[in-house]
Curated annotation (Swiss-Prot):
GO terms for molecular function: rRNA (pseudouridine-N3-)-methyltransferase activity. It catalyses: pseudouridine(1915) in 23S rRNA + S-adenosyl-L-methionine = N(3)-methylpseudouridine(1915) in 23S rRNA + S-adenosyl-L-homocysteine + H(+). It comes from Shewanella sp. (strain ANA-3). It is found in: Cytoplasm. Homodimer. S-adenosyl-L-methionine binds at residues 73, 104, 123-128. The keyword Ligase does not apply. It comes from the Bacteria. It holds the Pfam family SPOUT_MTase. This is Ribosomal RNA large subunit methyltransferase H. Belongs to the RNA methyltransferase RlmH family. GO terms for cellular component: cytoplasm. Its main location: cytoplasm. It is an enzyme of class 2 (transferase).
């Protein structure tokens, strides 16, 4: 199974790139974690946010290979504990499909992305900066993988 993190925003600070890559490289080849960056729409004083969200959403959906299981990261989503995320990851593997996880921009996800989702995950009730979300998601997925494989990374 492949995991695909599709996130709005490019040109992240080095600490974000290094943090994400640290967890990305830990995954085994049979569960690769890929990052796809979607350019953020230009925001300004008179920006048409609805149009920007729509365009970002179209680009995100276009980046998802046909047949992937889609999970949005969104406040109304499910709050998973590590064991619950590990269980969800097991189900994804048994389903036999790759997984695309969608992280929106400053205004969140386009309605079309939310409608296309099979699941929604609330990473935190806190508002987190989007660059940090990439690292937290990568670490959380790696930790869930470690639970499923009895790897010593996760300790109860």
């Amino acid at each position: 199974m492949k995991l695909q993190l599709i996130a709005v925003g490019t040109r992240m600070p080095d600490w974000v790139t290094r943090g994400f890559e640290e967890y990305q490289r830990r995954f085994p080849r049979d569960m690769a974690l890929e990052l796809i960056e979607i350019p953020a729409g230009k925001r300004g004083k008179n920006a048409d946010i609805v149009r920007i969200l729509q365009k970002e959403g179209e680009q995100m959906l276009a980046a998802i290979p046909k047949g992937n299981h889609i999970v949005t990261l969104d406040l109304p989503g499910k709050n998973w504990t590590t064991p619950e995320l590990a269980t969800a990851m097991n189900k994804w593997q048994l389903d036999g499909r790759d997984v695309s996880l969608l992280v929106g921009g400053p205004e969140g996800l386009a309605p079309a992305c939310k409608e296309a989702a099979h699941q929604s995950w609330c990473l935190s009730a806190l508002t987190l900066p989007h660059p940090l979300v990439r690292i937290v998601v990568a670490e959380s997925l790696y930790r869930a993988w470690s639970v499923n494989t009895n790897h010593p990374y996760h300790r109860e």
